[in-house]
């Protein structure tokens, strides 16, 4: 099943609205975490071909899923919640529920921009993929840099 094409600007606008409404109740660290990630999203919109921008935005969205769970669970007002407070809490929870879906769409955009999922089994250990590097004690002899191409004589150099 293929994901539908969703514009990154729509994702940003939706999370900006929900975060703004969530800040009615949860301010401080909730606002800093979410608006910082939205700034990374603006960077990803501005640089359409940047893999770094979209990967930072994706990583930030994943981090704010955890942070939002912590913020909502710690700072949830348990007494005398007004209608406005319930609305703000509801929007913060809706934002939290939509973030995994947004992560799927942003990951799809990351793959479209040429990003790859780099998972190494030897985390903090030596990697086994060294195909792009030549070892120092290689058995292959290097090509002779002073070899004369065929069809040209030794004295026909263009110095």
From Swiss-Prot:
Its main location: endoplasmic reticulum. Residues 110-122 are annotated as: Interaction with AGTR1. It is found in: Endoplasmic reticulum membrane; Golgi apparatus membrane; Cytoplasmic vesicle membrane. Appears to be a negative regulator of type-1 angiotensin II receptor-mediated signaling by regulating receptor internalization as well as mechanism of receptor desensitization such as phosphorylation. Also induces a decrease in cell proliferation and angiotensin II-stimulated transcriptional activity. GO terms for molecular function: angiotensin type II receptor activity; identical protein binding. One of its GO terms (cellular component) is cell cortex. The lineage of its organism: Eukaryota, Metazoa, Chordata, Craniata, Vertebrata. The modification Phosphothreonine is found at residue 135. It holds the Pfam family AGTRAP. This is Type-1 angiotensin II receptor-associated protein. GO terms for biological process: regulation of blood pressure; response to hypoxia. It is a multi-pass membrane protein. Residues 45-55, 108-159 are cytoplasmic. SMART domains: AGTRAP. Interacts with RACK1, and with the C-terminal region of AGTR1. Keywords: Cytoplasmic vesicle, Endoplasmic reticulum, Golgi apparatus, Membrane, Phosphoprotein, Transmembrane, Transmembrane helix. Residues 140-159 are annotated as: Disordered. It comes from Homo sapiens. Residues 1-23, 77-86 are extracellular. The chain crosses the membrane at residues 24-44, 56-76, 87-107. The modification Phosphoserine is found at residues 126-127, 138, 153. Ubiquitous but more abundant in kidney, heart, pancreas and thyroid.
């Amino acid at each position: 099943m293929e994901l539908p094409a969703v514009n990154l600007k729509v994702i940003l606008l939706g999370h900006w609205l929900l975060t703004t409404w969530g800040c009615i109740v949860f301010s401080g660290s909730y606002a800093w975490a979410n608006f910082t990630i939205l700034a990374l999203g603006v960077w990803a919109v501005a640089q359409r071909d940047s893999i770094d921008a979209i990967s930072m935005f994706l990583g930030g969205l994943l981090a704010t899923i955890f942070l939002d769970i912590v913020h909502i669970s710690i700072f949830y007002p348990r007494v005398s919640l007004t209608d406005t407070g319930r609305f703000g809490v509801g929007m913060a929870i809706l934002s939290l529920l939509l973030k995994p879906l947004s992560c799927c769409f942003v990951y799809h955009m990351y793959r479209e921009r040429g990003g790859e999922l780099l998972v190494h089994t030897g985390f903090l250990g030596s990697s086994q993929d060294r195909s792009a590097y030549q070892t120092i004690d290689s058995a292959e002899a290097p090509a002779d840099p002073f070899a004369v191409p065929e069809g040209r004589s030794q004295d026909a150099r263009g110095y």
